[in-house]
């Protein structure tokens, strides 16, 4: 189940639940992946958004087709192509676009909307 901040930005997913607790995986964790989509009128490019842990403060949007339109400041949202996340949850903003290995794909550095400061309140999406 995804969870979001009070203003709708994706924070992560619940990975384990017990009677009294829930374990979460933050979007910055290296084990976190979600389908992402560029939210712009001229482009609906699809890719995979991955966490990168403490080595980077930004996320990586990978596996974007080489011919997709992509630009700095594009909004990245969940694609809805995986059953665990509904479409349209804000993830972050593109800060840099690069060619992937051999020029077959593009990659984007994404600055998450989620603040890395302590989070006091989240919303859990249980039905979509």
Put a short name on every predicted segment.
Residues 1-128:
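A secondary-structure micro-motif
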